Amino acid sequence: MQRLILFFVLCIFLINPPIIFASNYSDGMNAMKNGNHEEAVKLFRVAAETGDARAQHCLGVMLNKGQGVKQNYEESFKWLNLAAKQGFSQAKLDLAILIYHKKGIPENYIDKFK
């Protein structure tokens, strides 16, 4: 019986891991609102790595601004691009701003559109 329960718990985890890690995004937002940017970055990174577009966007913005982490335009581009590819509209806007200012974009990125 215990093996059956363990099997079902494992199946639920494998089918939809973002549900389990959704609290990382919420906790990250709370940490950011309370001014604890370092903790927010850690929490957003965990959620972003599971594919949470909201967390990817927040992490990208924080990397862009250097909030709670050393400013890194290349990493910011990476996370904003991942969120934008999922259709997250604010990430698309922030990514466009990075591209316009040519910050953090790969050398051949703009050449693709010529």
Annotated model-derived regions:
Residues 24-31, 58-65, 94-101:
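Hydrophobic face of amphipathic alpha-helices that form TPR/SEL1-like repeat modules
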